[in-house]
Amino acid sequence: MDGASKVFFLDEIEDQRYEILMGDGVLGKKQENNARIEVSYLTTAGSESNGVRTFVFSGVLENPNGVSPSAFTTNITSTTASAGGEEIESTQKIKYTAPKAYGTQDRAVTADDYEAIVRQVYPATSDIIIFGGEDQEPPEYGKVFIALKPKDASYLTSLTKKSIVDELKKFVVASVEPRLIDPSILFVELTSKIYYNGSMTDQTPSQIRDKVIGGVQSYLDTSDTEKFNGKFRYSKMVGVIDDADKSINSNLTSVTMRKDFYPSLNSTFYYEVCFQNAFDEDCDDPVLSSTGFRVTEYPNFDVYVEDRNKKIVLYRLDSVTGEKVVLDSDIGDIDYVKGELKMYNLTIIKGSFFDNRISVRVKPLSNDIKALREVYLDVDVANSSFTAYKE
């Protein structure tokens, strides 16, 4: 760059505004007095652009000669929803992150250094946890593992992960290898029956329900529940539901844990699903349930799993009676104490949803749920059930 370079500089100033600086004749071309400068720019919708799956081609299609075809068809397929959009950093957030970023001194040594640099590289980070390879089983020395939960998405795309790691390598010291891994998301689902005094309010059950959902979401937004090393406190959640409206007398709320996994389609695989929380072994009904999926042995109908006699069984539903028909009485083991599922030699050809993921649900031994290390705790309000009853 020299004094003739046609460049300009963009700085952020007060009140979240931007300032354009032209060259001074040494760094960039200097503008003449009274020169007229026209500026055009694109703005984004920030976080409002997240979660988009359907896209339409709105451009102009031309061949190398600049000629457009008289008729053409475009088909845009999105494998994942858009993510990563973020609002401008607030002054409060800058005051919080700036000292941490300065403390790294542009090198990644401690866990705090890695966190500050990753948040700088990828601002749309909801939560992050870093641990050394020596804590892995088996140990992987010389590696640093980074589990990152993005905002408005469960996982990062492979392209985004590669971009973050490539940028992070500029700050890593010695021969340490950074590894960015997906979080293991542990979902907590609630089934709540809310009883309220109809003589104290003219609100309908649906209005009471909406108030409860709003109260629960507000609590989750301000508590340390949804995060790595998060803890779900049952008594606090019951209190939040009761306090959602003065007319509420009580609530009966049950807790279910859920994990989603993505099978390797058309391959015989061993699957292990760890919940890190013990299961309620003394239930009369099965502790384990799943969404439907398909396997090579039974490709024409959905199959499900549940636990019986400490074993995982594979079954289908009778199309007429709806009764469970056992197809295999032993496809894996369930460890109620460790909170683990192990399924052997499954060849899955189709999952439950559009992205082929499969959901498994279990009843926990304790209603207080914890998440450790790379496990991210997420209270899934959208898939929870809240029903209000007038007394």
Roles of regions detected by a PLM:
Residues 357-391:
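Feature of secretome-associated and extracellular-like proteins
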Residues 1-35, 340-351:
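A surface-exposed beta-strand-loop module
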Residues 69, 74-76, 207-298, 304-305:
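An aromatic-glycine-centered, glycine-rich loop/turn in mixed alpha/beta architecture
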Residues 105-228:
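Carbohydrate-recognition loop of C-type lectin domains
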Residues 223, 299-353:
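Extended, beta-strand-rich, solvent-exposed assembly scaffolds of outer structural proteins
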Residues 16-22, 26-109, 113-116, 381-384, ...:
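Catalytic P-loop NTP-binding/switch module of NTPases
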Residues 30-44, 348-370:
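Extended Gly/Ser/Thr-rich low-complexity repeat segments
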